[in-house]
Amino acid sequence: MSDIAIIHFVNYKRGTRSRAAMRGVMLYVMKEKKTAWEGGPLVSGINCQVQSVYDDFLNTKLLYHKDGGVMFYHMVQSFPKGANIDPRAAHEATRRLAGYFEGCEVLVCTHIDREHIHSHCIINSVNFETGRKVAYGGRTDSGAARSQ
């Protein structure tokens, strides 16, 4: 069996264009019962603080007057059922992956409550360094990132 992770972007039927949706998904992915592991929860912030992640994302949007439209992107990295990977190693692998979203605030949460370990990345749609909106995934760009 292969231990290669699968990565996909979540497509929300209700959308990613509201503050409530952004807050809701952040609260869901940070649930302690899903992220609890030896020594504490598998939750990290890249270019943001876990304790204030919603405010950090929103403040970046407000700073650049980009608080409309797509608010966030949700990427999931899943390891196969029975994969030989430690939850901390899975979390670190996802943190490294999140580091490729240069200039973006990313919330990384690893869930261990299912038969397969998987990590969620909630990515701010506004680059905190440039103030530009970033687009990931979609049907027309084959997963490439583009700035607006």
Where are these regions (language model features)?
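N-terminal nicking endonuclease/strand-transfer module with a His-rich metal-binding environment
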Residues: 1-148
